[in-house]
Structures are given as C-alpha cells and as structure tokens.
C-alpha cells in the first residue's frame, strides 16, 4: 500500500509529514524549510506557492494569504483577473505540498490525512475535503488538529494512562481539547475553541498601533495604502516573533510613504510590555475555552497530567503565562508546536495503512447537531463532544392537519433558537398521507462519519418513504465544479512542470556555453585544433538555437555540444596527465642521481 502523507493545512503555515518505519518525519520543502507559508501568488500566468509567494507579497497585489479563514464560506478572492473559491486556493497549497512530498518519496502520492481545527463546522470540513480532491488527493481522514498533536505526543507513551489538555493557538484559529491517553487509545473527552482567534489577530494589534502612531506623528493614514499595509503586516509578524525572545524590538520601514516634504520613514521601538498591553484582550479570550473544555470533560485541573502547546502563536510569552495561570501547570515543550500536527496526521495515515498497530483514535463532534422544530426552536439530536462516528434517530410529527410535506432544517450550534445557529442545509420529505396533525411518524436520523461530516435522513414510518442528504452548505461545491477544478489544477501542474523544465534547459545551455568558451580559450595553441574547431562549431549552433528561442533545437544542439566539448576535455586531460607523468619521471631520475652523490666513504677501525 502506498504511503499516506499527513498534512497540516494551516492559516499562516502548512507542513507535510510521512511515516518512516515507526517514526513520523517532516518533509522539508524545496527551499529546505520544514514549514511552508500558506501563501499563493499569481505572476505572468504562473502560480507561485510558499516562500517565493510570501517574498513577493509586498510588491504583487495578486497574492492571497490566510485563505483558511474563508473555508466553508461562499466568499471568493479575486486574483490574476479571476475569482477563486477558498477550496481552489487551498488546493494550490495542497498540490505544492503533495509535489515536494512526491519528490522526497520518489513515488506518486494519492492519499492524505488532512487536519482541521477541532472547532471547524461541517461546511469547513467539507470544504477541506473538496480542496484535497481538487489537488488530486483522496482524503482518507480529516483529523482535528489537537487530536493529531496528541497522537504525535503520545505515541511512545501508550502504555501509560494520562489525561492531557492540548492548547492549540495557530495563525487563525484556537482550540482546546481534553484527551485521555492509554493502552493505545486516544479518546477525546471534549473540545472547545474560537475559530476567529489566532496569530493573525496578534499581528493586527501591532499593525493598528503602528498605523495610529504614524498618523499621530505625520497626519497620514497608512491603512489606505495597500503596499504600505503589506509591509506593516510583514514587520508586525517579525516583531511578534522577536518579542518571544527579547523584551524590545526595533521596527524600521524606510520610505513607507511620501508626504508634502518628501519621503517618510517609519521608525518605532516596540517593547514586550506594550505588546502584552495591546493584546491583553486576545489572551483573555483563550481562557474561556479552556474552562469550557474542562467542564465538558467533567474534570478538574488537578486531574490533568500534561498541558501540550500546539501552534506557532503559543510561543508568545503572555500566552504561555496565561496557560500556566489557567491550568496551574508548566506546559510540556517536548514537541515542536509548528510540526507536531502534521506529524500526528502522518501517524494517523500509518494507522489507516496498518503500519501503526494497536492505536485507536476516538474523536468527537465539536458542536451540537439538530433540526428546527415548531416555534423556531433548535432541537438537538446529537450533543457536542459526542464520540464519532455516531448515529442518532428521533421521531417527530406534523404541525398541521393534512400536512403533505415536512421541511427538515438542519442546524449546528449551541443556542436554543434555530435562527441563532449555523444552517447546514435544508431538504423536504414529501407525499405524506393526509392525517390529523401529530399522527404521521417522521423519523429523523443524523449520521456523523469519522471525518465529522454529517448526513441526515428523514423517513415516514407509515409509508417507509425516505429522503437522505449529505450536508452541502451554501459554500459547498457540486461534483461538476470539483471535477472542473481538478482538471484546472492538473493543467496548471503540467504547465508548471513544463515551465520548470524550460528554465532548467536554459540554465544548462548558459552553463554549457560558459564552460565550453572557457575550455576553447584554455586549449588555444595546444595542438588539437580539430577538436577545438568541432567544439566551436557546436557552440555556434547552440548560440544560434538560443537566439531563435527554439527549445527543441536548443535541446538537440546542447547534446551535440556536450559530446564535442567532452572530446576536447578528454584531449586536454590526456595532455595534462602525460605532462604530469613526464614530470614525475624526471623528478624520479633526479632523485636517483642525487642519492648517489650523497654516498660517503667511512673508515672502519677494528678494536
């Protein structure tokens, strides 16, 4: 069975890992980095992903960042003169991760385990699965990020029972999960979180502060200048990271804008104390889900054995202090917060392929599921933190006499009224026989699969007629749309491959021309004119093909030049070797002669 890669598709950064033997290994990207920025940019028809895309974000307006925050919505992004769904942009990131994983493994990758925040709703999970499909990946499992982290943390501790709180603060989302680990079973007891809280919000606090201070000093509002704002974002992210290690950092942005008197520069010192003050409300927001998760798990703080930090934003000192204060425990720092989620996903991939034995993952649904009933009430069928996969049925009836159909309004959330919760979908059960209200028996069944994706069935117990839907939110893609996007993604991948081959060929041609010209110059007057003339003719042919920009001709002429240049190089080598041999022979003869000169006659006297 081929490898199933593990992917942490993050808001700010993404990572990919694979199981090698019993060890989960992060795969470095082509630039040698173990995480890849979740950034996509478009330039001259080319799709650029990762570090290269992030580097040009300041100057390229066709750059998309933090697309994960839009997953599960109908919102689209405009770039490259087109509109893209969040699934399509995410697929470009996944395709890039898949590509360099294939280069590392030396084989095609078709399956992946992809992680999502524990608090992702059904629409967001479905969107993630669709993104995988567009990227040419079969998503064998969607795993909650804190659960994946626990898998990576706890794999070597499966013989020891313990309860762990996973505190996961990423670039755009925040989750807390309480798990019980023991005998190879990873049992999620509860999860809570905030899908609108992450490192991006901490960056934004710094940006807002810089904009306000600059306006106060210079009377210019930088928030209306797109390029200045991108530079501020980069500077804010760097300052945030710096302040995890030092107590003060200098923010210097020369030529940030121009005033009446000429160019203006932004120079500011940001202390950790000021940063803590700016972000105090964000840190406070992390405390409520911790309490909620503990309460839902029915545990007290003293029953938690380990607190595991996940996500780059957990490096912020104020966040670490808040975790200590809230849990009364020193967080466990034995795992890399940027890499542990992808590593856990790869372990789950190993569980699926059978490479990892005796490990069972029991995850939960993060939000309650139910339907709207009479009076706009939200009636729950499955409570939050129910272990998945699961199925639950309940019988309802009609609200009016001779009602021919019932509308099933499927919802997810915790509020008592339907209007205050998230609509997952609607469908209708028709052809109900005429009867007084309350008589027809309509059985509604909810199914949640191992990926947390919901399907709902309504059945008239009188006629046995039933209607089933897999939930498609208003952001959901049809099979036709996914197929079209898959074809686009494949076409782009092929175009990117051809473009890379073209660049590699041009580089080879330049290198060959340079090397051959050097060799021809070095061999001047050394007696092998025939080889030099042949190499020069091949060199001229290649230069002509390069001028004509004929790729096929360049390829053929490059091969011809390499052959002629090799012949010339062999002659040069043979001549150098012969000269070396002659020199060694002469030195040997001289040494022998000198040895004779050094002989001294000695007198021997007998005693």
From Swiss-Prot:
Keyword terms of this UniProt record: ATP-binding, Chaperone, Nucleotide-binding, Phosphoprotein, Stress response
Induction annotation: By stress conditions e.g. heat shock.
Matches recorded under CDD domains: ASKHA_NBD_HSP70_DnaK-like
SUPFAM superfamilies assigned: Actin-like ATPase domain (SSF53067), Heat shock protein 70kD (HSP70), C-terminal subdomain (SSF100934), Heat shock protein 70kD (HSP70), peptide-binding domain (SSF100920)
Signal peptide as annotated in the record: none
Gene that this polypeptide is encoded by: dnaK
Phosphothreonine carried by residues: 173
Name of the protein in question: Chaperone protein DnaK
Family (UniProt): Belongs to the heat shock protein 70 family.
Function: Acts as a chaperone.
Source species: Streptococcus pneumoniae serotype 19F (strain G54)
HAMAP family tied to this protein: DnaK
Region (Disordered): 579-607
Domain of life from the UniProt record: Bacteria
UniProt GO molecular function: ATP binding; ATP-dependent protein folding chaperone; unfolded protein binding
Xref: Pfam families: HSP70
UniProt biased composition (Acidic residues): 598-607
Start-end of Low complexity biased regions: 579-591
Gene3D superfamilies in the record: 1.20.1270.10, 3.30.420.40, Actin, Chain A, domain 4 (3.90.640.10), Substrate Binding Domain Of DNAk, Chain A, domain 1 (2.60.34.10)
């Amino acid at each position: 069975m081929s490898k199933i890669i593990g992917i942490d598709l993050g808001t700010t950064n993404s990572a990919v890992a694979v199981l090698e033997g019993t060890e989960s290994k992060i795969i470095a990207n082509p630039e040698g980095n173990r995480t890849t920025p979740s950034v996509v940019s478009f330039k001259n028809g080319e799709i650029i992903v990762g570090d290269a895309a992030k580097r040009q974000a300041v100057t390229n307006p066709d750059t998309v960042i933090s697309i994960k925050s839009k997953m599960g919505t109908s919102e689209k992004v405009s770039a490259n003169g087109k509109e893209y769904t969040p699934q399509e942009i995410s697929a470009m990131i996944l395709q890039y991760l898949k590509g360099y994983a294939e280069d590392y493994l030396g084989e095609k990758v078709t399956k992946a385990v992809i992680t999502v925040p524990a608090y992702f709703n059904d629409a967001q999970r479905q969107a993630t699965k669709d993104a995988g499909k567009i990227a040419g990946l079969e998503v064998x499992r969607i795993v909650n990020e804190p659960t994946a982290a626990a898998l990576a943390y706890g794999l070597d501790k499966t013989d020891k029972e313990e309860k762990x709180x996973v505190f996961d603060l990423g670039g755009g989302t925040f989750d807390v999960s309480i798990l019980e680990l023991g005998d190879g079973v990873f049992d999620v007891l509860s999860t809570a979180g905030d899908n609108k809280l992450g490192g991006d919000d901490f960056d934004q606090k710094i940006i807002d502060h810089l904009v306000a201070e600059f306006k106060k000093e210079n009377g210019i509002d930088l928030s209306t200048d797109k390029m200045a704002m991108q530079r501020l974002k980069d500077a804010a992210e760097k300052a945030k990271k710096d302040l995890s290690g030092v107590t003060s950092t200098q923010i210097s942005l020369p030529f940030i804008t121009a005033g009446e008197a000429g160019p203006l520069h932004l120079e500011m010192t940001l202390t950790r104390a000021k940063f803590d003050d700016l972000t105090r409300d964000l840190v406070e927001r992390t405390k409520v889900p911790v309490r909620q998760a503990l309460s839902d798990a029915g545990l007290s703080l003293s029953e938690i054995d380990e607190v595991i930090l996940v996500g780059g934003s957990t490096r912020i000192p104020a966040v670490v202090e808040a975790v200590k204060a809230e849990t009364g425990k020193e967080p466990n720092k034995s795992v890399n917060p940027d890499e542990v989620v992808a590593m856990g996903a790869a372990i789950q991939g190993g569980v699926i392929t059978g490479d990892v034995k005796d490990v069972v993952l029991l995850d939960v649904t993060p939000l309650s599921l139910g339907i709207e009933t009479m009076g706009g009430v939200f009636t729950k069928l499955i409570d939050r933190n129910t272990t998945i996969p699961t199925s639950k049925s309940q019988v309802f009836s009609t609200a009016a006499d001779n009602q021919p159909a019932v509308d099933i309004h499927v919802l997810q959330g915790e509020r008592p009224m339907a209007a205050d919760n998230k609509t997952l979908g609607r469908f209708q059960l028709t052809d109900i026989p005429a009867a007084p209200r309350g008589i027809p028996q309509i059985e509604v069944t909810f199914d949640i699969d191992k990926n947390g994706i919901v399907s709902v069935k309504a059945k008239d117990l009188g006629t046995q007629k039933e209607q089933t839907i897999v939930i498609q939110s208003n952001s959901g893609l049809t099979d036709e749309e996914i197929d079209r996007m898959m074809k686009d993604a494949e076409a782009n991948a092929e175009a990117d491959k051809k473009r890379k081959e073209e660049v590699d060929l041009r580089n080879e041609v330049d290198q060959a021309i340079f090397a051959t010209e050097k060799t021809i110059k070095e061999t001047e007057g050394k007696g092998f004119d025939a080889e030099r003339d042949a190499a020069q003719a091949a060199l001229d042919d290649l230069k002509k093909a390069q001028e004509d920009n004929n790729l096929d001709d360049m390829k053929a002429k490059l091969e011809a030049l390499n052959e002629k240049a090799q012949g010339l190089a062999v002659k040069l080598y043979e001549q150098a070797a012969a000269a070396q041999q002659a020199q060694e022979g002469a030195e040997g003869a001289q040494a022998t002669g000198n040895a004779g000169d050094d002989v001294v006659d000695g007198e021997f006297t007998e005693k």
